[in-house]
């Protein structure tokens, strides 16, 4: 039997990388020949977590074609966010906490989706359900995922289940969640060495919304001006992406982890979708979104509603 690859979405974030590692570890303990892989570069926040808990990043692959016959998806399900060649392999399982869209399979599968803030919260349940002890390093990585997705428990996506899971994982990992979490988020918020192309692709996801193709990228920072001072360059790079992918809209959210607000740079032929979704008027392609920190809960649903009216 060939190795089953376990991976998250393209432009991987901390939940995608660490959940792939943690779930592959669980599947191996249950007797499956599983390997965690990644579909993109590791960002600064995730690298901080990997270094802290002394775990190597998963192997990078460009496509699943020729790599595996069977795969497991974590932290995503939409095919446009998944590996190239995903249509040509058998999906055995999906473990996710996002909406279900643009997803179909030829065979039955195990699909676990829960309305929680992080895939790692679901993985903790799976470890318990199978009676498998979580190693300290895996617990630390899973904690890192919850901290990342919840912005240290401040995001509206964060549930009581996520907070409870984080406390349990922090105890196993031997760290203080608040202290460790703030340092990890700060590591991810350092954008000083990032190129413009890296900024707009670090955490970018493409969505099918009605008849429209929309990409939403997000970066965390402690000062939005670190990005806004380069706005013209950012807009030019986004325009190239819009043209190359034939997108209708590209939203680049710059989220301040200290104030919990976002600035949005909007580019594309359908800016009115954004204006309708958030009841704002763009000023030179820019809008302030007070209290908005979550792409999943505070951006995607409103844009989807506007796009399907």
Curated annotation (Swiss-Prot):
InterPro entries named in the record: DDH_dom (IPR001667), DHH_sf (IPR038763), DHHA2 (IPR004097), DHHA2_dom_sf (IPR038222), Mn-dep_inorganic_PyrPase (IPR022934)
Cofactor binding notes: Binds 2 manganese ions per subunit.
Pfam families (UniProt xref): DHH, DHHA2
Organism: Exiguobacterium sp. (strain ATCC BAA-1283 / AT1b)
Enzyme Commission number(s) from the entry: 3.6.1.1
A GO molecular-function descriptor: manganese ion binding
GO cellular component: cytoplasm
Catalysed reaction equations from the record: diphosphate + H2O = 2 phosphate + H(+)
Alphabetically ordered keywords of this record: Cytoplasm, Hydrolase, Manganese, Metal-binding
Binding locations of Mn(2+) 1: 9, 13, 75
Designated name of the protein: Probable manganese-dependent inorganic pyrophosphatase
Family membership: Belongs to the PPase class C family.
Subcellular location: Cytoplasm
Cofactor(s) annotated in UniProt: Mn(2+)
Residues binding Mn(2+) 2: 15, 75, 97, 149
Principal place of residence: cytoplasm
